[in-house]
């Protein structure tokens, strides 16, 4: 057997009175540490809630004592999009010079945490297709929102997300491949939507709770030749 050291989180932050700059590897911006499923299982609501971490640079600006705006650029590493024909592990990230761009507005008070965010990702699955040079990209947008209310008796959380090619967030979906007349494969993302609700007691010793999650794969345009995604029929998903 072989033992390996696995780096999950390693960051540094430069702080000023109203501005902070963080760089390193930490949670995806869509995984909100204050608002994630409080299930007993270690999977933290995977498939309904984003999961994973990536190398990133984040700039956070305080607009008021409770309201902040974060701008983030990150690159997938350990968690990645699906591999197209001719691709190797994480080649879609390596081939793309543009990082994933993310913006998030968050309100945080003593009892309420709420936020809205958006993300744009442009990946290049391969640099060669059908023996020809390829610069075809799979472009996608994503939008999400969340809310948490907590007092001395109750904790209530809600989260919703919708967008294309959410495979790297350990959710269903990915992208489809389309054959062009010249043989080069082009790509379009598949759309995934998910939401969840988590209600639990705030008791310090025994805290019963209930979690409900729903996710839907809305597919993509017709005429595709190949599917590169999680959540389709097969021996492995």
Segments predicted by a language model, with ranges:
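Detector for outer-membrane/organellar transmembrane beta-barrel domains
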Residues: 108-236
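Alpha-helix capping and helix-loop boundary segments enriched in small/acidic/polar residues
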Residues: 47, 89-93, 135
């Amino acid at each position: 057997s072989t033992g390996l050291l696995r780096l999950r989180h390693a960051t540094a932050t430069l702080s000023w009175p109203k501005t902070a700059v963080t760089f390193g590897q930490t949670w995806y911006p869509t995984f909100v540490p204050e608002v994630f499923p409080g299930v007993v299982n270690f999977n933290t609501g995977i498939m309904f809630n984003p999961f994973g971490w990536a190398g990133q640079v984040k700039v956070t600006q305080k607009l008021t004592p409770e309201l902040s705006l974060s701008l983030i650029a990150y690159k997938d590493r350990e968690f990645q999009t699906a591999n197209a024909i001719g691709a190797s592990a994480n080649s879609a990230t390596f081939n793309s010079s543009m990082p994933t761009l993310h913006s998030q507005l968050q309100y945080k008070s003593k009892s309420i945490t709420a936020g809205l965010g958006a993300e744009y990702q442009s990946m290049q699955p391969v640099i060669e297709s059908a023996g020809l040079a390829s610069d075809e990209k799979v472009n996608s947008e994503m939008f999400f929102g969340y809310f948490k209310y907590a007092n001395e008796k109750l904790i209530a959380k809600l989260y919703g997300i919708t967008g294309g090619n959410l495979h790297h967030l350990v959710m269903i979906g990915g992208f489809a491949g389309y054959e062009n007349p010249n043989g080069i494969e082009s790509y379009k993302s598949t759309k995934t939507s998910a939401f969840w609700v988590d209600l639990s007691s705030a008791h310090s010793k025994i805290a019963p709770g209930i979690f409900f999650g729903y996710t839907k794969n809305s597919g993509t345009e017709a005429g595709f030749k190949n599917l590169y995604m999680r959540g389709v029929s097969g021996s492995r998903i």
